[in-house]
């Protein structure tokens, strides 16, 4: 199995800048995360940007707000369940060497398998190289707030918050022969 899997790797980078005075505050941060999974071609990358600021305009009025933006992109997340790579690996008899299955296709159409092309179990290299997926999510959320002080003991405050996201999911499966399939979903 060690020849089938890769060594996973993750790295994270963050930087932030802030300033605080007696009448205002400001903070900006940026983060980046890059991950490579244990399956070949498996990746997950994320970028985050946060801005937060507030100010006391005078003794009666103050405002503050925050916005966070993020983008997450994943490629070839592992499939789970019956047709995922792990289930296919578990179905391999002990007398079959994984090296013998690396050439998973004879002519680009039919996949090579120890059980024959019509069985429910697929060559794990076929699953790895012919079933692909990717997803990308953009997200923005935050708030804007205002506070009005009428007296030392009476004030009015209001906040507006939002959360918006858009996700795009793509999946392809080569199938056997001309029976391939592909789908694209946009979710907002």
Label every PLM stretch briefly:
Residues 1, 37-42, 48, 52-141, ...:
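Surface-exposed loop/interface segments of Gram-negative outer-membrane beta-barrel transport/assembly proteins
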Residues 15-19, 49-55, 142-148:
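Residues on the lipid-exposed face of transmembrane beta-strands in outer-membrane beta-barrel proteins
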Residues 10, 21-22, 56-58, 149-151:
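Outer-membrane beta-barrel channels and translocator barrels
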Residues 21-30:
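Transmembrane beta-strand segments of Gram-negative outer membrane beta-barrel proteins
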Residues 5, 9, 132-138, 142, ...:
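Catalytic cores of large soluble enzymes that bind and process phosphate-bearing ligands
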């Amino acid at each position: 199995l060690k020849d089938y899997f890769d060594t996973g790797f993750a790295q994270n980078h963050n930087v932030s800048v802030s300033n605080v005075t007696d009448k205002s505050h400001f903070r900006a941060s940026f983060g980046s995360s890059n991950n490579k999974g244990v399956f070949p071609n498996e990746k997950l990358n994320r970028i985050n940007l946060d801005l937060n600021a507030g100010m006391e305009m005078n003794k009666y009025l103050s405002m503050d707000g925050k916005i966070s933006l993020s983008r997450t992109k994943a490629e070839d997340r592992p499939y789970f369940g019956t047709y995922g790579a792990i289930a296919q690996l578990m179905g391999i008899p002990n007398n079959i060497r994984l090296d013998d299955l690396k050439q998973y296709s004879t002519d680009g159409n039919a996949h090579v398998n120890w059980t024959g092309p019509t069985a429910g179990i697929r060559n794990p290299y076929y699953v790895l190289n012919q079933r692909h997926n990717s997803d990308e999510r953009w997200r923005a959320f935050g708030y804007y707030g205002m506070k009005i002080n009428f007296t030392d003991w009476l004030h009015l405050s209001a906040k507006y918050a939002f959360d918006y996201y858009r996700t795009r999911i793509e999946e392809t499966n080569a199938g056997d022969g001309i029976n391939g399939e592909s789908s694209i979903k946009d979710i907002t």
